[in-house]
Regions:
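Viral virion structural and adsorption modules
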Residues: 1-21, 27-34, 38-99
Length: 99
């Protein structure tokens, strides 16, 4: 039996009062192929506040989302999350060159 060990990376941020959690699992010296994102909170649109709840899977090879699921998903906020994903991925891959 072969046991595979994975490294788990996690980060949190806030985008327009929406809580964003990023996570990835990967093997040593290999970049993660998928970054998972969970975003939830009240959308900043005045009196009729709606609660956004989104689960996203970002494919690092195609630089695109494999899936976007949830309720009241605001694409403007998703666009603001993309730079967070890019920074998260960059910081993970930087660790390979720092050893």
């Amino acid at each position: 039996m072969e046991i595979n060990y994975f490294i788990s990376a996690k980060a949190t941020a806030t985008v327009q009062n929406i809580n964003v959690s990023l996570s990835a699992e990967y093997q040593k010296d290999q970049a993660p192929e998928v970054i998972s994102v969970v975003a939830n909170g009240y959308l900043p649109n005045g009196e009729n506040q709606k609660y956004m709840n989104a689960a996203l899977k970002y494919n690092t090879k195609s630089s695109d989302f494999d899936s976007i699921n949830g309720a009241n998903v605001d694409l403007g906020i998703i666009q603001e999350i993309v730079p967070l994903i890019t920074e998260f991925y960059r910081k993970i891959t930087e660790t390979f060159t720092n050893y």
